[in-house]
Amino acid sequence: MHPNADVLQGTLDLLILRTIALEPMHGWAIAQRIQQISDELLRVQQGSLYPALHRLEHQGWITAEWGASENNRRARFYALTKAGRKQVDTEVAKWERLSAGVNLVLQRT
C-alpha cells in the first residue's frame, strides 16, 4: 500500500474505536497510533478523522473532553462510552465477515 494511502472507506470507525479502547486520546494521537500500529501502512487524514470523530460522538459511541496534550496544548480527548464498547464488537464482527468474503473471492478467482 502506498505510504500516503488513506484508510479504506468503512473501516475508519472500527480503527478509531479500537484505538481509543484502552485510553482516551486526542485526534492527532489517534491518527499517529493507527499509523504506528499498522507499520506505516495506514494514514488517517485530518479531513477524514475529525468528521468521523464528530459522527461517533453524535452516535453516542465516544465522548470528548478538553484537556492538555503531551506538549501542554489544549486538545479534545476522545474516550469510548459503554455503547461504544459494544459497538467495537459489532464493528469487529462486520470487518471479519467482510474480510472473509474478500479472501474467498481472492482464493477462488
Predicted regions and their residues:
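Beta-hairpin "wing" of winged helix-turn-helix
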Residues: E57-R74, A79
